[in-house]
Amino acid sequence: MKSYLILNTLLLSLLKINGFSKSSWFSSKTSLIFDRINKLNDPQSSNSIHSRKYQYFQLKKFPNSTNVRCNDGSIPGYYTRPSTTNCSKKWLIFLEGGWYCFNNNTCESRRRTHYDLFSSEFWSSERQLGGILSNNERINPNFHDYNSVYIPYCSSDLWSGKQLEKTNGLYFHGSRILDTVVDDLTQNQHFKKVHEVAFVGSSAGGIGVLLNIDRLKRRLKKKLKRKVFIHGIVDSAWFLDYPAYRQSNCTHIYECPPENALRNGMKLWNPRIPRRCKKFQGRGREWKCFMGPVIYRHLKNPTFIIQSLFDDAQLQMSKVPILEGGSNKKFSYIQQLGGFAAQTLRQAKGVFAHSCVDHEILTKSNWAYVSVNNQRLHETLNYWQAYLEGEKKKIKKKVQKNPKLIKTGKSPCKNLRKPKFSGNIDQSKYQLIDSCHISQITSYKIQLPHNRTLSRCANAIPLIPLCNPTCSPLSHPISGLSMSFIDLLELYNVRINLIAKSLGISMEQLRKMNTQQQISLLYCSSR
């Protein structure tokens, strides 16, 4: 916009110097130049990707007559932003995350400290959202050209509540809100042409996807009277049924193990749990269906899992916040927890799991560029998309007997983005789980004093937080400075200085090495 103003001013100045005015000779041909510049740079221009229409999500609240409510009784709604490609028939529906509450105390605390997750009273009429909801191709290579829907979270029930009436003075309408959004979208003329819907969610929103995706597909089919290809992307919602490091009295949401919190929460929420999972788990164990490793095996629609092996929320619930530090025993527990997460994720058809300490990855501006084994997340999703294209073809073959289900007419759109890959894709390309393989690290040549060399290592070592060099750095709890892998070990009383001394190197030399070199040296060097 600034460049346009400068150009405009310069052109006008030059014309005035030469005796021309905007109303004379200039007004014929030269005015066309200014008109085009204005159109390209006008933030309200319908053809500009920078226009407000394509940059901001617009709020649509449900009418007062609707029978869905946020916790406090206010009317919920959702935000939409059209694709910059007017022809796009692909939609991304994002479910917001934000923990939950499970009794009167935790719900009251939520009302006081996170009111926007409790009520729609102060929701803005428009929002600019980033991460996987950005329309910037650099930030969001995979979904920047999708029509996008953002559903704010105000039910505190992991998107599961179905009871119409209040419970303890509060509404828990999570699954009912999703039904209402889907029903409202199917009245949208643009949405009626939809070919593909990606249900995406982070944290509590990811659990919402796992619990509702199959049911919402059935609802869409019924409303549109045809099949639509549905798939899911679940971020930071693979919570584990794993013994906590220490016991807790469960008075605070961040301190309560999943089983205790979910058992209590279900009494408030009256949740809608997928029938297949509920039946498989049996009476009294339905709470397990909120756990990623349990519900995933019952899903009918392809769902891609994105997870930090050392998920920050999981560490809190397991009583081992990473920056709290502690003993070697505690660090060993953290490693075992990460290893268990990796083991359970192997069942996922599509997965990207890095050994970082992170949570809600898709909402960050750098989400696409986190890597595992030198393959970035957005590249992994490209391979997954190629796999999905194969699944779409299977669906088309099944409905060919009824041409009305697939006939869409000639499309005026010739330049729609196509999948980057096609044909048979090696499954390992969209199943990436970090393992800190030493064999991938020892390619570094490290010069040690006294002719010391790297010994032959085992194929893998126990998982280590931050062993992935693309992890976002942690901030030291005291200094606030970015922490290296070495700093993290020192936080757990590992005497790095003694190890360095035994290897004949200084701490300064050790700190100058990158993460992979440090791991290789500390875990593989002969002493």
UniProtKB/Swiss-Prot annotation:
Record's keyword terms, sorted: Glycoprotein, Hydrolase, Secreted, Serine esterase, Signal, Wnt signaling pathway
Top-level EC class as recorded in UniProt: hydrolase
Tissue: Expressed in the anterior pole.
GO (cellular component) term, any one: extracellular region
Catalysed reactions, as listed in the record: [Wnt protein]-O-(9Z)-hexadecenoyl-L-serine + H2O = [Wnt protein]-L-serine + (9Z)-hexadecenoate + H(+)
Family statement drawn from the similarity comment of this UniProt entry: Belongs to the pectinacetylesterase family. Notum subfamily.
Name of the molecule in the record: Palmitoleoyl-protein carboxylesterase NOTUM
